Design a protein with these regions (language model features):
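Glycan-recognition and catalytic cores of secretory/periplasmic carbohydrate-active enzymes
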Residues: 1-167
Length: 167
């Protein structure tokens, strides 16, 4: 491969990344409740206001990671914080060993809880990345707490899982 091809490929990748990130910033952010809407069509129209909890964590992580890689942009940092705050406030089932829900309503009411740990994993890495950017110790603490929950996942009482969530 020649240098010109690699430079063009790099330019194309950056353009695609910008399109994707701007799509989510423009259409996905929930300015009323926090977090992001996760059910959008290709035009950015919301077709369900239910929110995937693991996607809240994934967006919280990716926006903080973008700050780590490309430099801090306030809108990226704010988007990450919005997702993390939404998760901390609404997405942790305090009555089930701090396990996270899988799906919640737009305003954070629980809809479904699963037995696997995707929500916890993304919340953990999102807090770690956010802490790395901001130095805000509470996010380090949240990440450690969540990591400990995630490590114990196979041993947690699964009786807390709503049977209807397996439908």
């Amino acid at each position: 491969m020649n240098k010109e091809f690699l430079l063009e490929a790099q330019k194309w990748a950056k353009e695609e990344l910008d399109i994707c990130i701007n799509f989510w910033l423009k259409n996905g952010l929930d300015k009323e409740n926090g977090g992001v809407y996760t059910c959008l069509d290709r035009e950015g129209k919301i077709y369900s206001t239910d929110k995937s909890v693991w996607m809240q964590g994934r967006c919280g992580w990716i926006f903080a990671y973008l700050c780590h890689v490309y430099g801090v942009k306030e809108e990226w940092l704010a988007a990450s914080k919005s997702c993390l705050d939404f998760m901390e406030k609404y997405c942790i089932n305090r009555e089930c060993g701090d396990r996270m829900y899988f799906t919640v309503t737009a305003d954070g009411k629980p809809l479904r809880q699963r037995r696997y740990c995707y929500s916890e994993a993304f919340y953990c890495i999102a807090n770690a990345e956010y802490y790395g950017i901001t130095g805000e110790k509470e996010h380090l603490d949240f990440g450690i707490r969540d990591h400990n929950v995630e490590i114990l996942c196979p041993f947690l009482n699964t009786a807390c899982v709503d049977v209807r969530s397996r439908e």
